[in-house]
From Swiss-Prot:
Subunit: Heterodimer of an alpha and a beta chain.
InterPro entries in UniProt: Globin-like_sf (IPR009050), Phycobilisome_asu/bsu (IPR012128), Phycobilisome_asu/bsu_sf (IPR038719)
This protein's record includes keyword 4Fe-4S: no
Family: Belongs to the phycobiliprotein family.
Residues the record lists as binding (15Z)-phycoviolobilin: 84
Source species of the chain: Nostoc sp. (strain PCC 7120 / SAG 25.82 / UTEX 2576)
Keyword set, alphabetical order: Antenna complex, Bile pigment, Chromophore, Electron transport, Membrane, Photosynthesis, Phycobilisome, Thylakoid, Transport
Gene Ontology annotations of biological process type: photosynthesis
GO cellular component: phycobilisome; plasma membrane-derived thylakoid membrane
Pfam families: Phycobilisome (PF00502)
Protein name: Phycoerythrocyanin alpha chain
Localization per Swiss-Prot or TrEMBL: Cellular thylakoid membrane
Post-translational modification: Contains one covalently linked bilin chromophore.
Length: 162
């Protein structure tokens, strides 16, 4: 999994040398942001389920047809609603992993890769998840550097889905 730390080490190893000044700056940058990243990950751990449920309700309000149309990709049944919350929760959990490692590696490997094919095959609209993640970003209640760390990866996921 790619992270700022593994990329710096890999680049130095390929050259057969110690970390360069630029690579050391990347490593120090990660450590400087680590406290905020871990606090953001903790916020996701503490609130992720609640955020996923609130985001799903926002999606149902923004796209009312999702609760009115039948089919496995819609939220017209309790099972459909449960799947929607589960999917949003999966995004949020993966974003929390990004906050821990300080890079987009978890999203790239576990979510973004093959995402459009998966959504297409299942008849899922990326706009539902974009709306859900935007809702979480705009309503998570985090502040300062912690919000900044969370929002980096929320925005990355939103852009990947767009």
């Amino acid at each position: 999994m790619k992270t700022p730390l593994t990329e710096a080490i890999s680049a130095a190893d390929v050259r057969g040398s110690y970390l360069s000044n630029t690579e050391m700056q990347a490593v120090f940058g990660r450590f400087n942001r680590a406290r905020a990243g871990l606090a953001a990950a903790q916020a996701f751990s503490n609130n992720g389920k609640k955020w996923a449920e609130a985001a799903a309700n926002h999606v149902y309000q923004k796209f009312p047809y999702t609760t009115q149309m039948s089919g496995p990709q819609y939220a017209s049944t309790p099972e459909g609603k449960s799947k929607c919350v589960r999917d949003i929760d999966h995004y949020l959990r993966t974003i929390s992993y990004c906050c821990v490692v300080g890079g987009t590696g978890p999203l790239d490997e576990y979510v973004v890769s093959g995402l459009s094919e998966l959504n297409s095959a299942l008849g899922l609209s990326p706009s539902w998840y974009v709306a859900a993640l935007e809702f979480v970003r705009d309503n998570h209640g985090l502040n300062g550097d912690v919000a900044g760390e969370a929002n980096i990866y929320l925005n990355y996921a939103i852009n990947a889905l767009s």
